[in-house]
């Protein structure tokens, strides 16, 4: 009986290993076609962050790994605002930031920057930094071809550069954190370090200003880079939360920094 069980179990185990091996090979092949990587909840690419360079792409000019740590030593946060610029909410964000002496990184889509070059210039003039957030905000970019990813990144860079008058564009944030090794290499080759996040209160879902604030404070233990939005819809709740958040952060001894570039 024991020998029979062992024979049956061994056969099933071998078959299962074969099935899992085939599945892993298929997934690896699929990833190779698109450069896709499995991401964590904070825009992290896990082990793939140390992936090899693609010889068919230009060499990186800056660090390829995804940035989340602040430039400033000590207790600091990185405020980031996505999906703008927006003619209603970006000026409000600038006003709130100025009132607290805070700095932020604005992750702009190319078309929005192109439509509102005056706002792009105001962001730069106020001492904030710019980040490339692609052209079409395609959160499935990591499942598209490398050529598609490159066009999204470089077309957005051109639009933002033109809108800003050539201000430094230090970062690239993939929509939804849909980074690939190739997109990170392409961005780095053009001077943009990939930018992740640690804190995501889901403000784009409009859960209420108090909920946004409470979630940010709870998630700060995850790390210093806070993801908020100044574009893509009604951001009144985000602005209210930001207005309440900044004085609290200062009271708790946080400095306002920029992500390492």
Q: What would you call each of these model-derived segments?
A:
Residues 94-107, 129, 146-177, 185-188, ...:
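CE4/NodB-like, metal-dependent polysaccharide N-deacetylase domain
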Residues 178-219, 253-261:
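His/Asp/Glu-enriched short active-site or ligand-binding loop at hydrolase and phosphoryl-transfer sites
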Residues 132-134, 195-198, 225-230:
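Short beta-strands and strand-loop turn motifs
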Residues 1-78, 95-105, 222-261:
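Terminal accessory/targeting
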Residues 84-91, 114, 143, 147-150, ...:
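Soluble non-cytosolic domains of exported or imported proteins
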Residues 110-113, 136-140, 175-178, 200-203, ...:
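Short histidine/acidic/glycine/proline-rich micro-motifs that form metal-
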Residues 93-95, 120-122, 145-146, 186-189, ...:
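Short, glycine/charged-enriched secondary-structure capping and boundary segments
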């Amino acid at each position: 009986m024991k020998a029979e069980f062992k024979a049956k179990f061994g056969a099933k185990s071998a078959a299962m290993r074969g099935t899992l091996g085939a599945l892993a090979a298929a997934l690896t092949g699929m990833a190779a076609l698109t450069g896709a990587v499995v991401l964590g909840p904070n825009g992290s690419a896990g082990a793939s962050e140390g992936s090899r360079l693609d010889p068919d792409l230009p060499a990186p000019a800056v660090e390829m790994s995804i940035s989340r740590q602040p430039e400033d030593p000590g207790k600091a946060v990185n405020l980031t605002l996505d999906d703008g610029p927006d003619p209603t909410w970006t000026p409000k964000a600038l006003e709130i930031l100025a009132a607290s002496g805070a700095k932020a990184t604005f992750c702009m889509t190319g078309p929005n920057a192109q439509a509102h070059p005056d706002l792009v210039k105001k962001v730069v003039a106020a001492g904030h930094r710019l980040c490339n957030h692609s052209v079409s905000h395609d959160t499935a970019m990591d499942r598209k071809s490398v050529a598609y990813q490159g066009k999204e990144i470089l077309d957005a860079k051109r639009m933002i550069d033109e809108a800003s008058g050539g201000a430094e564009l230090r970062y690239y944030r993939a929509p939804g954190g849909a980074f690939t090794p190739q997109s990170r290499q392409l961005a780095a080759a053009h001077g943009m370090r990939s930018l992740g996040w640690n804190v995501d209160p889901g403000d784009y879902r409009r859960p209420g200003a108090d909920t946004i604030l409470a979630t940010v404070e709870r998630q700060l233990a995850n790390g210093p880079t806070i993801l908020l939005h100044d574009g893509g819809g009604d951001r009144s709740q985000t602005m209210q939360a930001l207005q309440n958040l900044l004085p609290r952060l200062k009271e708790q001894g946080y400095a306002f920094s920029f992500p390492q570039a």
